[in-house]
């Protein structure tokens, strides 16, 4: 869309009676050949109304980045994420009900202060259940001024690295398995030139 159309869409979104799902529908109604794609959604904002709009708007990519961070409820609570593993999995199931072809990506942090091996196993089991198309994985690093930076942490960087390596190996395997399902098919793609460093 043109800058003028983009600005108009931004003005519409500032109105209190228009939420993000409504905005997607309004942008979808703009004439032209384009794809609607948004970068990230906090699980609290991933609603059935949003999934329905994404499914019904033919210009909207069936792609969502839904950061989970951890598959363990205690760790999620310590992170102040505002949802549980069960609630997150229910959102994923609902999104895929509306969009069976949904491409789903996520962020995961390993080694959050106090995360045990058993709690990390919950994260591994979650990614096996969800089967993300891609994951952005990180080893926790403290940020000054945050509550987590003051939490006791008995685990070493080396122990966290072992978990990280296991997570990356599982993520890569799942991603490859999912991508192989597209072999022999023809797909319309969106090339993001801002990600290409020449």
Predicted regions mapped to residue ranges:
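Pocket-edge positions in alpha/beta enzyme catalytic cores
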Residues: 1, 15, 80, 112, ...
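Single conserved hydrophobic/aromatic residue that forms the stacking wall/gate
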Residues: 1-9, 13, 196-197
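Conserved SAM/AdoMet-binding glycine-rich loop
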Residues: 7-117
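OB-fold and OB-like beta-barrel modules that bind single-stranded nucleic acids
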Residues: 64-66, 135, 189-191
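A non-catalytic, amphipathic alpha-helix used as a structural packing/dimerization or gating element
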Residues: 90, 94, 122, 126-129, ...
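N-terminal intrinsically disordered, low-complexity, charge/repeat-rich segments that act as generic
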Residues: 101-149, 153-154
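Terminal RNA-binding accessory module
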Residues: 139, 150-195
């Amino acid at each position: 869309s043109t800058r003028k159309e983009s600005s108009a869409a931004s003005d519409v979104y500032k109105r209190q009676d228009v939420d993000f799902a409504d905005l997607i529908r309004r942008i979808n109604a703009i004439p032209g050949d384009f794809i609607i794609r948004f970068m990230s959604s906090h699980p609290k904002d991933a609603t059935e109304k949003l999934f329905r709009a994404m499914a019904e708007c033919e210009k909207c990519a069936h792609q969502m980045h839904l950061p989970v961070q951890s598959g363990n409820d205690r760790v999620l609570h310590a992170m102040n994420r505002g949802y549980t593993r069960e609630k997150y999995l229910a959102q994923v199931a609902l999104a895929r009900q509306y969009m069976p072809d949904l491409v789903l990506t996520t962020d995961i942090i390993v080694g959050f202060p106090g995360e045990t091996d058993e709690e990390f196993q919950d994260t591994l089991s979650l990614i096996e259940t969800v089967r993300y198309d891609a994951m952005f994985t990180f080893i926790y690093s403290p940020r000054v001024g945050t509550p987590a930076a003051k939490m006791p942490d008995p685990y070493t960087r080396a122990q966290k690295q072992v978990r990280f390596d296991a997570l990356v190996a599982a993520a890569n395997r799942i991603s490859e398995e999912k991508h192989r399902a597209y072999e022999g098919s023809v797909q319309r793609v969106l090339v993001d030139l801002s990600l290409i460093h020449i």
